[in-house]
């Protein structure tokens, strides 16, 4: 129906630069191991870009029947209810979402950061983890993931005061697997100072 649109996705090695044309970024099952082993905590994700500009994102938490959507010109909602922008709280009253291996190996100081928080949650799905960031249930999410894992949350998060950066504080390339952090802009300097990634 849209022959001039492109797809970026993990399945079938579908690749197209999000900066070129109209691009749909798709992840039909995020959290595959959770899906197989537990039958829950997996997500369906989609994002849409025009010439590199994110127009909207969608994360569907299947087992909880929660649909997160919006971003760009659209309000971000969960099952139709508007989500508020990030509301600052002391770090020691917040939880962190993370890749288990990166946390246990203190990758780029991640465990150092976690020591200043209430605790760490390893959920096994980027989509589930980042949707909980959007709801204010997690301060941020840290993992090594690909564009189809983070595109939807990036678009929605920008609308709510979050940013997606590499673990060294750089913009993402939207082309490869990278170690990323999805964090509130308001806490960025503080978080990066604990990680040792803040630019001088």
Predicted feature descriptions by range:
Residues 1-29, 193:
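N-terminal subdomain of lithium-sensitive/metallo-dependent phosphomonoesterases centered on the IMPase/IPPase/PAP
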Residues 7, 32, 61, 70, ...:
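Residue-level signal for inorganic ion chemistry
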Residues 9-11, 80, 124:
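Short loop/edge segments at beta-strand edges and connector loops
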Residues 18-74:
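DPxDG-like acidic metal-binding loop motif
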Residues 53, 75-78, 82-84, 163, ...:
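Short helix-loop capping/hinge motifs at secondary-structure junctions, enriched
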Residues 62-92:
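ATP-dependent small-molecule kinase catalytic core of the GHMP/sugar-kinase superfamily
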Residues 87-200:
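An extended, acidic
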């Amino acid at each position: 129906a849209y022959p001039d649109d492109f797809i970026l996705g993990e399945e079938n090695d579908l690749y197209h630069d999000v900066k070129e044309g109209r691009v749909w970024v798709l992840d039909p099952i995020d959290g595959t191991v959770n899906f197989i082993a537990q039958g829950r905590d997996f997500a369906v994700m989609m994002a849409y870009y025009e010439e590199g500009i994110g127009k909207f994102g969608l994360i569907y938490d299947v087992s909880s029947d929660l649909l997160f959507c919006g971003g760009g010109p659209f309000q971000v909602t969960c099952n139709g209810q508007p989500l508020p922008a990030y509301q600052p709280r002391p770090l020691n009253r917040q939880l962190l979402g993370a890749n288990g291996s990166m946390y246990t190996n203190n990758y780029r100081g991640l465990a150092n950061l976690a020591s200043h928080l209430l605790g760490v949650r390893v959920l096994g799905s980027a989509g589930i983890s980042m949707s909980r960031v959007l709801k204010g249930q997690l301060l941020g999410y840290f993992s090594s993931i690909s564009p189809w894992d983070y595109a939807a949350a990036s678009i929605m998060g920008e609308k709510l005061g979050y940013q997606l950066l590499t673990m060294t504080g750089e913009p993402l390339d939207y082309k490869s697997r990278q170690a990323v952090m999805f964090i509130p802009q308001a806490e960025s300097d503080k978080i990066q100072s604990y990680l040792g990634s803040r630019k001088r």
